[in-house]
């Protein structure tokens, strides 16, 4: 299985939706709470050039946010990323 990392905050409904979506896909993930770690928040903002959460990475691929992940899945691109070897 791929290495999935999701950057979240406690009060973000799209973060909850993204975690639920990944769980339904059977994907395990590591969650990084950027509201609790300003250093991680700065790192993900620099890496993605985005200020919103969630931000989802599958291995070295930046998927984007929840809507981006769902759109990728509809195009058939999410399953291959999740199935890739880490």
Outline where the language-model segments fall.
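Local sequence-structure signature of Cys/Sec-based thiol-disulfide redox active-site neighborhoods
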Residues: 1-28
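Non-catalytic, surface beta->alpha helical segment in thiol-disulfide oxidoreductase systems
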Residues: 58-85
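Structural alpha/beta surface segment adjacent to cysteine/selenocysteine redox centers
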Residues: 25-28, 41-53, 57-63, 67
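Residues that form or flank phosphate/diphosphate-binding pockets in enzymes
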Residues: 13-16, 39, 64
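Thioredoxin-like thiol-disulfide oxidoreductase module
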Residues: 34-51, 80-84
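ATP/adenylate-binding site constellation spanning eukaryotic-like Ser/Thr protein kinases
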Residues: 9, 50, 75
């Amino acid at each position: 299985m791929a290495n999935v990392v999701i950057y979240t905050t406690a009060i973000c409904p799209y973060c909850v939706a993204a975690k639920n979506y990944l769980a339904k896909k059977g994907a395990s993930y590591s969650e990084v709470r950027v509201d609790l770690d300003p250093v991680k928040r700065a790192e993900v903002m620099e890496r993605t050039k985005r200020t919103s959460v969630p931000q989802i990475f599958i291995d070295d691929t930046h998927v984007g946010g929840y809507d981006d992940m769902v759109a990728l899945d509809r195009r058939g691109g999410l399953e291959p990323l999740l199935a890739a070897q880490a």
